[in-house]
Amino acid sequence: MLNPDPQSCLSAWDEVTSPNILVLGDLMLDRYSWGTVERISPEAPIPVLRLVREEERLGGAGNVVMNLKTLGCKVTVSGLIGKDSIGNQILDILSKEGFDNSGVQQVSDYPTVLKHRMIAGHNHLLRLDHDPPAGYQYLNYSNLLSWLDSILPSQQALVISDYNKGTLHPSLIKSTIQIANSLDIPVLVDPRNLGDYEIYKGCSWIKPNRKEAGAATGISIRDQETALKAAGILQQKLNGAIIALSLDKDGLLLFQSSEEFIFFGTEALEVFDVVGAGDMVISILSMLVSSGATPSIAAHWAQLGAAMEIQHVGVVSFEREEIRKRFVYGHTSTKIVSLKRLQQELALKDESPVVITNGYFDKLSSTHLKFLGQLRKFKGFTVVAINSDASIQRKKGEPPLLDEMERARLLASLQSVDRVLIFEEDNCCEVFRCLKPKIVVKGARYQHRQIEESQVIEEIGACVEFLPEYSL
């Protein structure tokens, strides 16, 4: 079976509107403690994390919910949380993000799941888990099932995100799948269950990882042959469900039958963090499947999204246009970001100063390269902000020689440049206000000229450095 052609992939992606997708699963709270390590504790041979900031996000099935919202889907969330402070925080986040909480039930005998990660730079130092007791099963699910029965007719897909925390009783899963089947709604399952997959019978898709598929089939998945064997056994157990088997470093296997399968490889890029990759796969699959895309096209985009996810520390949700640009322009586009994305990214970084320069960067030449090559002397995180095509047209009265994405890609290919962003305004004032750089770099001629953004530079307390090679 051949990989889908690029034009078909793009057409399917661009045809997606805002499908209604219901996510049923184990809702958790992810807490991140970000800091720096500068010494070893005198009490024990362990690093001392100096706390810089903390952040709380939706985790587990909640991560799928946030992925789908960021992708532009209309998302309905359902699950079980405890009547505790962690559960209340989940409800607060859902409300702030604009979700209806009517499908989320709070119960007194369940401790809401918390995953507390402690991180220095790109290194996870420790994860502290707050889990329910082993073997916990929530039995009083009749009200939740009634709610699911009432809401499913308005949905275009159902995602079951089962982290095996006891909130999804096997009978609840079976009944919900039966209701969805009666309505011809595709059901996509992300299982953490290492045992009985019979409870998922009737699902349209299932997305196990290597470990989960191995445990469910008794096969040690070492290569493509054993992966195909395991996928075939799973499909028999699940009455013909499509298998999207995540093979970590080896990519993704799409298995429709023993004659119809594709291995999607991974790009040879640096992996920072695998957390959230599986959730990204099920999110993109559900969006495209609910929109009528073919299995091969849906899996192709899902694997691309996972490749983007593992290049970030912590869980990241991507907008649809970000993933599209990665497809069109390749992996160099990971350096090309929106202002919103860059703000989020900088909030999670260490205390390295932000160093920024801006300009048209049209008609790129060796003098530009010399100028940009010297940005590293400031020992910070370097950002190049470029005027959009429309901005240049307004300011110069003519379009640039190179369009904005060509300019951005060329700049992103330079080792001295960490990120590139394109701004629509006529000046860089808003970018400076949002990013609050420590250093603004200009060409030498600006030592004797008025800098357009000088007032903002003064407001944010940045210093201006001048480089001699080129004036922007």
Language-model features, listed with the residues they occupy:
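Short, glycine-rich nucleotide/cofactor-binding loops
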Residues: 24, 49-58, 166-167, 356-368
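Short, flexible loop segments at boundaries between secondary-structure elements
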Residues: 53-56, 184-198, 460-472
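Conserved post-catalytic alpha-helical subdomain immediately downstream of the catalytic base
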Residues: 241, 267-326
